[in-house]
Amino acid sequence: MGRHSTKTSSAFTKLAASTIAFGAAATIMAPSASAAPDSDWDRLAQCESGGNWAINTGNGYHGGLQFSASTWAAYGGQEFATYAYQATREQQIAVAERTLAGQGWGAWPACSASLGLNSAPTQRDLSATTSTPEPAAAAPAVAEYNAPAANIAVGSTDLNTIKSTYGAVTGTLAQYGITVPAEVESYYNAFVG
């Protein structure tokens, strides 16, 4: 094209260029819908049930996310337990992900709105028949450590603190389906007598 020739553009070319530019800008500026992280479910449970995943309020809603029996059954909850409060936190979250995929965050209207929840559902694969994880192919070597003996008198407040702390830790682990290794139990029992 010559230097002094007039440039012409068709209306179609202008429209196409505008559409592509607008689409690119919208894609870049749109918030991404990431998967619902566990922290969202924990926040929702805190709002719905005070964070108690095993709650049975007696009002027809159960578990940390306050499932009705019909919603629990409709989204496959009975694969894990009859009612949500009888299922683990992870199982309740798996059913919640299915509920989220089917109903959106409107299944928990007040709390999801007040918390600003908007993430997309995530498929979680939990099997009701698999209650314990598969053993690892090869366990790493255990380093031996002989700790110096502590001088704590039986009945002292230090020993009571150890007992209460150990009880709290094992109780929390049990809520998540984690058992304390036998070696740790035997060390603890040998220590506290």
Swiss-Prot record:
Identification of the protein by name: Resuscitation-promoting factor Rpf1
Lineage top rank: taxon: Bacteria
SUPFAM superfamilies to which the protein is assigned, alphabetical: Lysozyme-like
Localization of this protein: Secreted
Enzymatic class: hydrolase
EC number(s) stated in the UniProt entry for this protein: 3.-.-.-
Family affiliation: Belongs to the transglycosylase family. Rpf subfamily.
GO function term, MF aspect, one: hydrolase activity
Keywords: Hydrolase, Secreted, Signal
Loss of function: phenotype: Not essential; a double rpf1-rpf2 disruption mutant is also viable. The double mutant displays a prolonged lag phase and slower growth after transfer of long-stored cells into fresh medium.
Source organism (scientific name): Corynebacterium glutamicum (strain ATCC 13032 / DSM 20300 / JCM 1318 / BCRC 11384 / CCUG 27702 / LMG 3730 / NBRC 12168 / NCIMB 10025 / NRRL B-2784 / 534)
Signal peptide range in chain numbering: 1-35
Chief place where the protein resides: secreted
Job description of the protein: Factor that stimulates resuscitation of dormant cells. Has peptidoglycan (PG) hydrolytic activity. Active in the pM concentration range. Has little to no effect on actively-growing cells. PG fragments could either directly activate the resuscitation pathway of dormant bacteria or serve as a substrate for endogenous Rpf, resulting in low molecular weight products with resuscitation activity.
GO cellular component: extracellular region
